[in-house]
């Protein structure tokens, strides 16, 4: 430092001896005056802006004045030096000794338009404009260095006024964290992501992020707000120029994040339905305290399976099921699902004494956090897409609807069924003509107690009436629970002994000698035609109140005589014998395949996912229970999950999660991403239809992948 000070002193002494000190300052003043005029009249270039910013940064102005319009980013190594005064210049020798770091994609689109990124050899400060940055911020110099200290609450900057509606991965940036892509060393060719905290500390993985949030007692940032995936970009959310948002929030504030609706195809609106994000009736106060088999009292975020009883419960059931992979830890990993758990995930419940904010075993109970948009596609009807990049294992939404119970199920003989089928087929064509001219209003609203209290209308021909679930119907006995999808425009009943579905598990195993029946998760191939039928079904249509015309996703618990500790009872199954329905979508032309997806996305589909390696044949499905059939009806009430489309190479997993009860008959059906999903990509899941099961009623698939099964239903 003394040598550097001596060099500076020698420099000015030489100028003084030559009588050029005044000349040097006059030149500096001329430069400042020129920059001032260019900035005022708008003729300044990006280089002029950067030069002026650096000069102001080195001047004697206060930091609040220099940071009033934005933040500063330095592309030098964040670990060099201690806290440096903003007035101290940086010499060339210091810059040469610093290793470069490549800025994260989160900052790429934040610079002014046309701004060029400086070379790593120079230290340049660039203003970063944060989108929707209408907050009152504290001073946040991003060239801060790390002082060895014990992190606490004082390490965090002021909490933003509001974080609702933001990209969840952008929230750390809003809170003055830096997300950087950097090389581990000069010889490395791969980039890695790290975060730099407001106090200068580097976070290199999720474990370090978790411990930092614990140490600082942060209650507004969580582990799922961070992503170390180099493919994830934080600002790739630019909408199309011709996009017109018809509804800013179809949930009407029910969800913590707005879910807009956009139609770029025509002027049709969403069907009228009641938006609900729960399956339980709102007018009843249900007591779930006696429906939990265990609870925890963790104080360190429920991350240690040796201490957390809820994690142990998930692992115990997964280990007892032969469909689970050996050697892998069951459950979430820092609030992200890395693989499917056939036996279900047991989240921490209301009896647990752990911190609800820092608990890593509470995910879906926090609700939708990613930004979604309902839109209309050219061939597949209504669909859902993400507005931001989503990392693998991220929770998207649940499948919600109205919980009903089918009472006194009766079998209909084949002769009567044939006559009923003929009658319904005839009615379907007249109904088609009526539905073609009817357009429902896009009037999604929240549940009302009066609507919940009204029983559904039942047709006189309905052999299996359904009644709504209430607190008197719910018990812990073994039941056969079903999730019902929204109706299609035309529903045809038929009798079929064949079951179908796809297995959401790692492998298949037959019944063992002890009578153990493995858990099986099968998704109804008839359960996902909401996007094609909802646009023409007004809420007040009396024909639509026939509950047996809804698509069904069957979630059942098998009845084994084996010990409870070795049971793997939970399953999601479709039984065509019980549903007795075939969907026929009128008003649709013969479907044509869309162009194949990009090679990178196709490669992900060509490689079999662990959950799709083995399919259990229909003959080995479990015998459905004939008692107390529970239905989850989304035809009139539901959430954004009712609009999710099918794909033979889906980007969503279907996972059963137990939150409000440990009763195996009442899981929540949750959707998680099974890979990285780029912004504005449609979110899909596999309906699991077996091609050839019902050849007369099959519909062509529209997913467009090379390994497409070609048939949707």
From Swiss-Prot:
Keywords: Cell cycle, Cell division, Chromatin regulator, Chromosome, Developmental protein, Metal-binding, Methyltransferase, Mitosis, Nucleus, S-adenosyl-L-methionine, Transferase, Zinc. It is an enzyme of class 2 (transferase). In the pre-SET domain, Cys residues bind 3 zinc ions that are arranged in a triangular cluster; some of these Cys residues contribute to the binding of two zinc ions within the cluster. S-adenosyl-L-methionine binds at residues 380-382, 642, 645-646. Histone methyltransferase involved in left-right axis specification in early development and mitosis. Specifically trimethylates 'Lys-9' of histone H3 (H3K9me3). H3K9me3 is a specific tag for epigenetic transcriptional repression that recruits HP1 (CBX1, CBX3 and/or CBX5) proteins to methylated histones. Contributes to H3K9me3 in both the interspersed repetitive elements and centromere-associated repeats. Plays a role in chromosome condensation and segregation during mitosis. The keyword Lipid metabolism does not apply. Residues 87-109 have a biased composition (Polar residues). Residues 294-367 form the Pre-SET domain. It is found in: Nucleus; Chromosome. Pfam families: MBD, Pre-SET, SET. PANTHER family: HISTONE-LYSINE N-METHYLTRANSFERASE EGGLESS (PTHR46024), HISTONE-LYSINE N-METHYLTRANSFERASE SETDB2 (PTHR46024:SF3). Its EC number is 2.1.1.366. Residues 161-233 form the MBD domain. Zn(2+) 1 binds at residues 296, 298, 302, 308. Residues 78-109, 511-549, 579-608 are annotated as: Disordered. Zn(2+) 2 binds at residues 296, 310, 348, 352. This is Histone-lysine N-methyltransferase SETDB2. It catalyses: N(6),N(6)-dimethyl-L-lysyl(9)-[histone H3] + S-adenosyl-L-methionine = N(6),N(6),N(6)-trimethyl-L-lysyl(9)-[histone H3] + S-adenosyl-L-homocysteine + H(+). PROSITE patterns: MBD, PRE_SET, SET. One of its GO terms (biological process) is negative regulation of gene expression, epigenetic. GO terms for cellular component: chromosome; cytosol; nucleoplasm; nucleus. Belongs to the class V-like SAM-binding methyltransferase superfamily. Residues 370-688 form the SET domain.
């Amino acid at each position: 430092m003394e040598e550097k000070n001596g060099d500076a002193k020698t420099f000015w002494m030489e100028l003084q001896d030559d009588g050029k000190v005044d000349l040097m300052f006059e030149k500096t003043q001329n430069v400042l005056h020129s920059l001032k005029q260019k900035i005022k009249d708008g003729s300044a270039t990006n280089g002029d802006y950067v030069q002026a910013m650096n000069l102001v940064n080195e001047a004697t102005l206060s930091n609040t004045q220099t940071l009033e319009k934005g933040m500063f980013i330095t592309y030098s190594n964040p670990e060099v030096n201690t806290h440096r005064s903003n007035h101290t210049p940086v010499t060339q020798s210091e810059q040469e000794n610093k290793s470069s770091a490549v800025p994260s994609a989160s900052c790429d689109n934040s610079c002014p338009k046309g701004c060029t990124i400086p070379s790593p050899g120079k230290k340049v400060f660039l203003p970063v404009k944060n989108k929707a940055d209408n907050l009152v911020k504290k001073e946040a110099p991003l060239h801060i260095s790390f002082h060895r200290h014990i992190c606490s609450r004082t390490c965090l900057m002021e909490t933003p006024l509001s974080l609702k509606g933001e990209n969840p991965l952008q929230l750390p940036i809003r809170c003055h964290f830096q997300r950087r892509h950097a090389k581990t060393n000069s010889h490395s060719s791969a980039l890695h992501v790290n975060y730099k905290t407001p106090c200068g500390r580097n976070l290199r993985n999720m474990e370090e992020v978790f411990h930092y949030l614990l140490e600082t007692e942060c209650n507004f940032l969580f582990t799922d707000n961070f992503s170390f995936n180099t493919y994830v970009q934080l600002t790739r959310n630019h909408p199309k120029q011709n996009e017109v948002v018809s509804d800013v929030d179809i949930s009407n504030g029910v969800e913590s994040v707005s879910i807009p609706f956009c139609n770029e195809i025509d002027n049709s609106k969403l069907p009228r339905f009641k938006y609900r994000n729960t399956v339980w009736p709102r007018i009843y106060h249900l007591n779930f305290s006696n429906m939990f088999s265990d609870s925890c009292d963790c104080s360190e975020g429920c991350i240690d399976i040796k201490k957390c009883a809820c994690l142990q419960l998930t692992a115990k059931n997964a280990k007892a099921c032969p469909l689970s992979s050996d050697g892998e830890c069951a459950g979430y990993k820092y609030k992200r699902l890395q693989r499917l758990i056939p036996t279900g995930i047991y989240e921490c419940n209301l009896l647990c004494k752990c911190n609800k904010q820092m608990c890593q075993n509470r995910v879906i109970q926090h609700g939708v956090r990613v930004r979604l948009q309902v839109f209309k596609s050219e061939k597949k009807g209504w669909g859902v897409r993400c507005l931001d990049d989503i990392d693998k294992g991220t929770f998207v939404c649940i499948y919600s609807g109205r919980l009903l119970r089918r009472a006194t199920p009766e079998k209909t003989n084949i002769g009567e069924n044939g006559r009923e089928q003929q009658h319904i087929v005839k009615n379907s064509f007249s109904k088609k003509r009526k539905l073609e001219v009817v357009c429902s209003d896009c009037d999604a609203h929240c549940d009302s107690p009066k609507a919940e209290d009204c029983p559904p209308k039942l047709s006189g021909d309905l052999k299996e009436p359904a009644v709504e679930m209430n607190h008197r119907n719910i018990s812990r006995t073994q039941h056969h629970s079903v999730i019902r999808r929204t109706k299609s425009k035309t529903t045809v009943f038929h009798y079929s002994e064949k079951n179908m579905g796809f297995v959401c598990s790692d492998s298949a195993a037959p019944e063992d000698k002890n009578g153990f029946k493995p858990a099986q998760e099968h998704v109804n191939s008839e359960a996902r035609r909401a996007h094609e039928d909802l646009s023409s079904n007004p809420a007040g249509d009396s024909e639509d109140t026939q509950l047996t015309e809804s698509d069904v996703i069957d979630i059942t618990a098998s009845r084994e005589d084996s010990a409870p500790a070795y049971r793997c009872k939970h399953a999601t199954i479709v039984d065509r014998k019980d549903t007795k329905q075939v969907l026929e979508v009128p008003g649709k032309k013969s479907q044509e395949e869309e162009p194949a997806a990009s090679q990178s996305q196709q490669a992900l589909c060509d490689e079999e996912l662990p959950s799709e390696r083995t399919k259990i044949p229909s003959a080995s499905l479990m015998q459905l229970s004939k008692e107390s059939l529970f239905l989850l009806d989304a035809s009139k009430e539901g959430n954004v999950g009712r609009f999710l489309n099918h794909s033979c190479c889906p980007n969503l997993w279907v996972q059963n999660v137990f939150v409000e009860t440990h009763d195996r008959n009442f899981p929540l059906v949750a959707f998680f991403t099974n890979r990285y999903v780029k912004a504005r990509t449609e979110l899909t899941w596999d309906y699991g239809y077996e091609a050839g099961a019902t050849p007369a009623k099959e519909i062509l698939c529209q997913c467009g992948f090379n390994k497409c099964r070609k048939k949707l239903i």
